């Protein structure tokens, strides 16, 4: 192994000499305490190292030892329900081992417990041919998720021996004989370099929407399975609650939640809340299918980059089993700030607003690892990783580099608006600024699962909301009574859309999740009201009378009505009442 000594220290960046033979992105142990670091630059025999722990107290002359391996994630049973820091050190295990409320420097605890035993049930037999990605057995990791044990990358051949029973993650469970007669032992744990995307057979088109149960996100700005989305918004606009809602209700099997440089108390909220939340899909706890990566703002900045790559590697591992994974990163801006700080320490040429010139390529490397794929292996498995990245632009300025570079990469943009949040309109996603480029891809799915006219109704409702925004400027100057009758109807129906459809109560048992069919029926009902109201106005009805009809109260009750009762009883009754009351005005 390469061994050198420290010549310079600048915050999280350390320079060591005598490092000839070291490799880029190799993990090294820095100083007498053996702090974890990663080589990010090599020049002759000097190595520039970013250190993932606090460097205070280290002095020039202390040793630097190479490990010969890149920064890698340990992947295997025991990750679900776990809480890691940015470099996949298990926080609960560190607390148990050190009895400290802080992470001591240089502490080394395996990411996955070597003592815990897991019940392994084989799904292949001796003599079966296997290749990388094939599932050879299962482990019931939690009540919600069955962990599938796969053949590691680079191994293929014939099963010579396979066991059944309780094993630790490092005990051999099978032996594979390769084509050249070599015998390879298979254990339940794999290691994978976090900067390298895991392989797959092919990427599949994003044709199926990720149903989140949130009306605004699903109906107007849908995210496809395997897609990437950004949630930019200023402080207090509801980024974290929006991400919690997605984690709770999305039709993904597994959630990886990365708290990247966020406040400690926000991460504490997640850690306290998630273990108590019930997962209505499985009936178990939400934590049973969640991996938490807590990397708060007071932890060393270099670890923010590692936390993002560690999170996406864990997500890809579960994707390779054929699961759907939702990865939420809160917030990518803090990672970009860490890049800016380290770039400054390296004395690199700054780009826009001091961020490094490679900001956009690093963001792209991360977001491009999302996707719906045909997984490796003989069996026809499909899995997906969806990325939802929160962005925290200073002062809510969407033109700043992190937001603008993110928007070039992702196809869904949910713009949070502080003004909507102040008016208590939640989710505070601004429907005039947001967009989704997946609409054409997921349109067929919506038509098959709701109705043929889904797209027309959705587009018509969107046009009304845009017209309302144009009319609001006139209304503020001269009042609504000066508008033509049809435009007064547009204002009234747009208000119904905003209050009775777009607003959603995250704390209501009924309204917290809204199925695609209920979403379509609610929107169709409001648009039926609009078309009947326009006809009534053309026949001479007064818009003031239309605004007073009692059926509007029934429309307001739609979201708080259980789905079955709404679809079978309330919706047909409302449509009938709309015709009756509006016809009576003519």
From Swiss-Prot:
UniProt membrane topology term: Peripheral membrane protein
GO annotations of cellular component type: plasma membrane; proton-transporting two-sector ATPase complex, catalytic domain
Disulfide-bond pairs as recorded: none
Top-level division of the source organism's lineage: Archaea
Compartments (UniProt record): Cell membrane
Gene Ontology MF terms: ATP binding; proton-transporting ATP synthase activity, rotational mechanism; proton-transporting ATPase activity, rotational mechanism
Glycosyltransferase listed as a keyword: no
Residues that, per the record, bind ATP: 233-240
Catalysed reaction, written as an equation: ATP + H2O + 4 H(+)(in) = ADP + phosphate + 5 H(+)(out)
GO biological process: proton motive force-driven plasma membrane ATP synthesis
UniProt keyword Ion transport present: yes
Known EC number: 7.1.2.2
Keywords: ATP synthesis, ATP-binding, Cell membrane, Hydrogen ion transport, Ion transport, Membrane, Nucleotide-binding, Translocase, Transport
PANTHER family: H(+)-TRANSPORTING TWO-SECTOR ATPASE, V-TYPE PROTON ATPASE CATALYTIC SUBUNIT A
Record text on subunit structure and interactions: Has multiple subunits with at least A(3), B(3), C, D, E, F, H, I and proteolipid K(x).
Similarity remark: Belongs to the ATPase alpha/beta chains family.
Cited function: Component of the A-type ATP synthase that produces ATP from ADP in the presence of a proton gradient across the membrane. The A chain is the catalytic subunit.
Name the record gives this protein: A-type ATP synthase subunit A
Native source species: Methanococcus aeolicus (strain ATCC BAA-1280 / DSM 17508 / OCM 812 / Nankai-3)
């Amino acid at each position: 192994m390469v061994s050198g000594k420290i010549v310079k220290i600048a915050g999280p960046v350390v320079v060591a000499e005598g490092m000839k033979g070291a490799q880029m992105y190799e993990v090294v142990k820095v100083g007498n305490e053996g702090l974890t670091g990663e080589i990010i630059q090599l020049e002759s025999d000097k190595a520039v190292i970013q250190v993932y722990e606090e460097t205070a107290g280290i002095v020039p002359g202390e040793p630097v030892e190479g490990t010969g391996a890149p920064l890698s994630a340990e992947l295997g049973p025991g990750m679900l329900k776990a809480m890691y820091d940015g470099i996949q050190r298990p926080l609960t295990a560190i607390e148990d081992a050190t009895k400290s409320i802080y992470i001591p420097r240089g502490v080394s605890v395996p990411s996955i417990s070597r003592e815990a035993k897991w019940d392994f049930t084989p799904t292949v037999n001796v003599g079966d041919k296997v290749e990388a990605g094939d599932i050879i057995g299962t482990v019931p990791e939690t009540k919600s998720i069955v962990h599938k044990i796969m053949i590691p990358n680079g191994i293929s051949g014939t099963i010579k021996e396979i066991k059944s029973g309780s094993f630790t993650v490092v005990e051999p469970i099978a032996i594979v004989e390769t084509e050249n007669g070599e015998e390879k032992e298979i254990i339940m744990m794999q290691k994978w370099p976090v900067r390298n995307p895991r392989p797959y057979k092919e990427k599949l088109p994003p044709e199926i929407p990720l149903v989140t149960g949130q009306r605004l996100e699903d109906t107007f700005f849908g995210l496809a399975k395997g897609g990437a989305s950004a949630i930019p918004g200023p402080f207090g606009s509801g980024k974290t609650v929006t991400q919690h809602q997605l984690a709770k209700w999305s039709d993904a099997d597994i959630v990886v939640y990365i708290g990247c440089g966020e406040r400690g108390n926000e991460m504490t909220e997640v850690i306290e809340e998630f273990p108590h939340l019930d997962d209505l899909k499985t009936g178990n706890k939400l934590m049973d299918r969640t991996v938490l990566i807590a990397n708060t703002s007071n932890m060393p900045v270099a670890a923010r980059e590692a936390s993002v790559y560690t999170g996406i590697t864990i997500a890809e591992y579960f994707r390779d089993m054929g699961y759907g994974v939702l990865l939420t990163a809160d917030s990518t801006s803090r990672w970009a700030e860490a890049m800016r700080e380290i770039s400054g320490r390296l004395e690199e040429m700054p780009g826009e607003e001091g961020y490094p010139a490679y900001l956009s390529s690093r963001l792209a490397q991360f977001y491009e690892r999302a996707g719906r794929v045909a997984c490796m292996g003989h069996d026809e498995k499909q899995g997906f990783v969806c990325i939802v990245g929160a962005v925290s632009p200073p002062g809510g300025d969407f033109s700043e580099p992190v937001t603008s570079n993110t928007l070039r990469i992702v196809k869904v943009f949910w713009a949070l608006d502080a003004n909507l949040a102040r008016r208590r309109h939640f989710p505070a996603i601004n429907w005039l600024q947001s967009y989704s480029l997946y609409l054409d891809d997921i349109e067929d799915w919506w038509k098959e699962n709701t109705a043929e006219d889904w797209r027309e109704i959705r587009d018509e409702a969107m046009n009304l909301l845009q017209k309302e925004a144009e009319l609001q400027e006139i209304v503020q100057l001269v009042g609504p009574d000066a508008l033509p009758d049809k435009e007064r109807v547009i204002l009234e129906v747009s208000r119904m859309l905003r209050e009775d459809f777009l607003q959603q109560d995250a704390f209501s048992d009924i309204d917290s999740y809204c199925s695609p069919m209920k979403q379509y029926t609610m929107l169709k009902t409001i648009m039926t009201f609009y078309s009947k109201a326009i006809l009534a106005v053309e026949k001479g009805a007064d818009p003031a009378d239309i605004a007073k009809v009692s059926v509007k109260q029934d429309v307001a009750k739609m979201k708080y009505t259980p789905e079955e009762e709404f679809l079978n009883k309330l919706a047909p009754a409302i449509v009938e009442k709309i015709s009756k009351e509006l016809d009576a005005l003519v």
